[in-house]
C-alpha cells in the first residue's frame, strides 16, 4: 500500500490552478467568495456566484479605467488622478446613472455654464423689423 493520492510513484503532480485562472480573470475569485460568505448576504453561496460577481467587478473596473485613461490623455497627463475618474464617470450616461450618488474625493465638478449666463448673439436687424 502506498500513502498519498494513489498515483504512480515519481509522477509529476498536476499544478493547482486558481478559480480566477480557470475563468480567465485577473480579480481574485477566492477573495470575493470569502467576502460573500463572511458578509452575511445569504446562508449559502453557490460556486458560480463569486465567479460571475468577480467578472462583473473586473469589467466595471476596466471600463472606468479606460475612460479615465482617455480623460487623462485628453488633458495631456500620463497619470490618472481622481479628477479624471470624475470626468470619465460623469460624462458616461450609464456609469453616471450607476454611480450617481457617489462622491469622488478631489474629483471636482463638471464644467457647465448655464445658457442664461452666456452672452447674447448679436443679430443683424432684418428687413421685416424695419417698418
UniProtKB/Swiss-Prot annotation:
Phosphoserine PTM sites in chain numbering: 128
PROSITE patterns assigned to the protein according to its UniProt record, in alphabetical order: HISTONE_H2A
Name of the protein in question: Histone H2A.2
Family of this protein: Belongs to the histone H2A family.
The UniProt record lists the keyword Phosphoprotein: yes
Extra facts: In contrast to vertebrates and insects, its C-terminus is not monoubiquitinated.
Modified sites of kind N-acetylserine: 2
Assembly and oligomerization: The nucleosome is a histone octamer containing two molecules each of H2A, H2B, H3 and H4 assembled in one H3-H4 heterotetramer and two H2A-H2B heterodimers. The octamer wraps approximately 147 bp of DNA.
Residues under site feature: Not ubiquitinated: 120
Entry PTM: Phosphorylated to form H2AS128ph (gamma-H2A) in response to DNA double-strand breaks (DSBs) generated by exogenous genotoxic agents and by stalled replication forks. Phosphorylation is dependent on the DNA damage checkpoint kinases MEC1/ATR and TEL1/ATM, spreads on either side of a detected DSB site and may mark the surrounding chromatin for recruitment of proteins required for DNA damage signaling and repair. Acetylated by ESA1 to form H2AK4ac and H2AK7ac.
Known function: Core component of nucleosome which plays a central role in DNA double strand break (DSB) repair. Nucleosomes wrap and compact DNA into chromatin, limiting DNA accessibility to the cellular machineries which require DNA as a template. Histones thereby play a central role in transcription regulation, DNA repair, DNA replication and chromosomal stability. DNA accessibility is regulated via a complex set of post-translational modifications of histones, also called histone code, and nucleosome remodeling.
Organism: Candida glabrata (strain ATCC 2001 / BCRC 20586 / JCM 3761 / NBRC 0622 / NRRL Y-65 / CBS 138)
One GO MF term: DNA binding
N5-methylglutamine PTM sites in chain numbering: 106
Domains (record comment): The [ST]-Q motif constitutes a recognition sequence for kinases from the PI3/PI4-kinase family.
Residue numbers of N6-acetyllysine PTMs: 5, 8
Biological process (GO), any one: DNA repair
